[in-house]
Regions:
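Terminal amphipathic alpha-helical/low-complexity segments used for targeting or macromolecular assembly
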Residues: 1-64, 174-186
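Structural signal for interior beta-strand "rungs" in well-ordered beta-sheet cores
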Residues: 61-62, 66-168
Length: 186
């Protein structure tokens, strides 16, 4: 239960519209998708009940409009704001304190086996409609701009925008200190 409480506290801290824990538990699709994913991931990786895991994942997608493969690994304090249209592929690895907005895709390359989805390191911000495709890495506390398409690695502590995404800004030491002290990009 500790992880679910931590997830709920993450929503309270990151969404100024959240009025209570009860409101989050009852009405927040991003929270529902996260909690259901944690259950599906356990079924998929620990219990080895892959069909049941896919059924939980399918129910979550039906309920929330957010598609997270049960094989994806998601760290602590994961935050989804306005989650419709989110896709997270099977071999995706997401670190702690990652924030993402609506219609973000962490997609694969079409390879049949092996690592084919992105690695998103701690503290990354994924803006609306951004796409990260293939086995690339987005470094710690990077910010991916709205509608950016990431096809190559993005270094830590940078901002990337465009199609294809290019680094347009390297964060200052003061920004890095602020981001890492308060638990991620705001």
């Amino acid at each position: 239960m500790g992880r679910f409480r931590e997830d709920m506290e993450t929503y309270k801290r990151n969404d100024p519209a959240a009025r209570s824990s009860l409101e989050i538990v009852l009405t927040y699709p991003g929270y529902h998708a996260t909690v259901l994913h944690r259950a599906a991931h356990w079924l998929h990786t620990k219990a080895k009940l892959k069909l049941l895991a896919r059924m939980v994942s399918g129910f979550s997608r039906f309920l929330t409009g957010i598609e997270i493969h049960p094989g994806a690994t998601i760290g602590r304090r994961f935050f989804i704001d306005h989650g419709m249209g989110i896709v997270i592929g099977e071999t995706t690895i997401i670190g702690d304190d990652v924030k993402r907005f609506h219609a973000v895709t962490l997609g694969g390359t079409g390879k049949d086996t092996g690592k084919r989805h992105p690695t998103i390191e701690n503290g990354v911000l994924l803006s609306a409609h951004s796409q990260v495709i293939g086995p690339v890495t987005v470094g710690e506390y990077a910010k991916i701009g709205a509608a950016a398409v990431v096809l190559d690695d993005i270094p830590a502590h940078t901002t990337a925008v465009g199609l294809p995404a290019r680094v347009v800004r390297v964060h200052t030491p003061e920004e890095i200190e602020r981001d890492t002290t308060i638990g991620g990009n705001l």
